[in-house]
């Protein structure tokens, strides 16, 4: 699949080997062993193992599923039907359980010699992860689901001891706000398993959709799973048979599927189906745009609590996981404050604030789940709202130091901070990134990898790490229509673009001790994994070329030395500020330019798969006092009469508070007129500032001021202002937004 490669492979190998400081045990023939996540111990020995059609797979009787999995993966790519030998002591590849030799859960020992392969695990999970390591030793074509011809199926001789540092290595997939079909979920599980992640948080319920069949309440999926008009409705759900199939698929791959049944908030899809679940009983529609509904599950009605018991009973019977996720985030408590039934419960339980009702409800559910041998998991709000006595597990997404509170209150924690592990944020601000969440700064691959996980509370309370992929951007946008005639599911491609390669960074953060992590080493190994992702048909985000050096010359120019972030890929570049294409000049030696902002370079994997360019954003440090750069106008955009100018400010509006918007005239000879400014949350008008002001070179700044008191994370914000050129259209300028009060 990697047909578009340069002739510079050896040159790049030398550059990367010099640039990366590799551990001693990886130094021998390091190009052959590039494992992710990095094992605890690797010792390379002499020789290679060669797989052949006569190779056999022997296994302990308890490992039949893992043996059949290995047989299937090797069979698809080699075309060979390798023979399985149950309870065999002699086989080419031998899978055995021996807790005495491997002392840690999910640990394994892998011995590859020219004569054969021995894989020993403490448990089935360890065997499965040993298989994943073994597959990474074979050529990347091993991941193809079609027979690959002309491949030498060779693995280097090596001894590997390995085990995870943390028991919880998770990923959340949001199928509620956008429905992914069963086959895509299987592919997602495959990709998680490939990199030794073992927990899939299945976000099945949200305001925008109910995705789990509950037989006692059929309208949840008949009504709550669909949005939009009948002729163009969107949505879907998983039958209970679908769920059983996914669970079985995950079990072989050591992926535990944990259902998330959201309450008390994010439950509008259920309220649409059964209005009596809410405090008001009002009829709603399943939203086609993301927002946080004020409607909550009514805590004061026995009928609502019985609904919750019934749904959780069916869910627990369906999912064998020892955990059940109850969500619990972002509740707005005004409905409970206004509800007579909820107020009665508050009085009965001696609660002072409506928010404490959430703690009361969490206690009720946690006790119910404890009786069913389940542990409740939820977002950190579940132990921050009220006094929760029964131990729960909190997903720390907002403030990592809340792990301290979890410990103090007798709970455990999983780190999934939005600042590092929310994969619906873009990796960069480079123009050309696809539509993404913007209420926080981008999360680069390096930032994801740099997350610290043991600085906030005793290690025993932090079970591990989890990444999250939210799908609310799908229901904002129009760029994700499926292209049927090309057989292209753009929504699935979009999900993979945001998840990969950051999932590989998450894998290593979750698996390895913090002291064993090194980003340069990881980046080197990662460069050899993209071709493996290609053979898995994964639509990953291609990383930009790596700037190894950027040195000034004696003449004041700048010399760029680059290396490809993807092994064997091309680098194409331009020096005039234009975006490179696959036909731009090929980078082979350092490039010198007079102005770095005119230098662009892209990584080209193949003619249809390439990166965004290296991009140097303009320097706005001189305008720091005005806040964050938001937009600009140029002569081409200037109209001769007052016309609404609309631009997005999502991310710059970051919470409730008072903001200023400054329009700064930077160039031109004629004045620029500004009129009334309006702030929108999606299509809802939040603020309007009537004003008429003229700015020019002598009086270059116009400032507007407004207050936001109904902020919603994940919701797009826009500014619309009347603007025009006065006696001409030669002006240019910048717009900045500053939050001045909380």
Regions picked out by a protein language model, each given a short descriptive name:
Residues 622-654, 686-706:
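Extracellular carbohydrate recognition and processing domains
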Residues 663-669, 721-727:
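Short beta-strand-plus-loop segments that form exposed binding edges in beta-rich domains
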Residues 376-381, 388-392, 398-559:
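Flexible, acidic glycine-rich loops studded with aromatic residues
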Residues 285-288, 292-390, 397-405:
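Active-site neighborhood of glycoside hydrolase catalytic domains
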Residues 27-30, 58, 523-628:
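Short, compositionally stereotyped local motifs that mark structural "simplifiers"
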Residues 1-32:
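Bacterial Sec-dependent N-terminal signal peptides
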Residues 102-323, 339, 364, 368, ...:
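Feature activates predominantly on carbohydrate-active enzymes
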Residues 28-166, 510-520, 528-530:
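Contiguous, structured surface segment used for ligand recognition
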